[in-house]
A protein has these predicted regions:
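Extended alpha-helical interface modules used as scaffolds for assembling large macromolecular complexes
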Residues: 1-168, 195-201
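Domain-level recognition of nuclease-like catalytic cores that cleave nucleotide substrates
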Residues: 172-201
Length: 201
């Protein structure tokens, strides 16, 4: 459901939903940031409270944690609820990025909100063929800025990357046969419409 909605949004715009995935796989962090900020601005411009009717039907948006096409969580009934939620949690961005990622289901096992190491990662992408493929194993962690603890999005990205390391989220990828040197970590930090993506490489 969420996958279909994401694709539907891009049909109405000039955006290419594959561009982000391509940038991710070649580790082009600059392109990832540019893409996500353009899309974030476009999406949230349509949800500004009291400005104009939403083109994106916010009542259909749900939190998505199942890449097999099953969307879970409560639907959002108005734009103010959506905007408030995205300021307080990373669930919307989590679901949105998952909607982009599932296009790679043939190459990756895509998991979300599962246990690995000493905690639960947000998104993990495990190459289906770990022996004959050069595809990297990927871990994505999402955080909304906590102004009581962080002064900038850069600090939020750092916090996300530290969590990946401290909680040993690599454990599942390593058990699946992905080599340590072929694992990448990405921290996603959010503040309103602003997005910052960073890596520990």
């Amino acid at each position: 459901m969420f996958y279909d909605m994401v694709r539907g949004w891009f049909k109405k715009s000039a955006g290419n939903y594959n561009a982000f995935v391509k940038a991710l796989l070649i580790n082009d962090v600059e392109a990832m940031n540019e893409y996500m900020n353009v899309i974030s601005e476009e999406i949230f411009s349509n949800f500004d409270v009291g400005t104009k009717p939403s083109k994106l039907q916010p009542e259909r948006l749900v939190s998505c944690y199942d890449c097999n096409g099953v969307a879970n969580g409560s639907s959002l009934n108005d734009s103010s609820n959506l905007y408030a939620m995205t300021r307080k949690s990373s669930r919307f961005y989590h679901g949105f990025v998952l909607g982009l990622m599932v296009d790679k289901r043939d190459d990756y096992i895509i998991k979300s909100n599962k246990e690995s190491g000493f905690g639960r990662y947000d998104v993990m992408m495990i190459p289906r063929d770990t022996e004959n493929s050069n595809l990297p194993g990927l871990i994505l962690e999402f955080k909304v800025i906590n102004h009581s603890m962080e002064k900038s999005l850069e600090e939020t990205v750092k916090s996300a990357l530290q969590q990946i390391e401290e909680k040993k989220y690599d454990t599942e990828l390593l058990k699946a046969g992905v080599k340590k040197e072929n694992i990448r970590h990405y921290g996603f930090a959010f503040e309103g419409k602003k997005v910052l993506i960073g890596t520990d490489e």
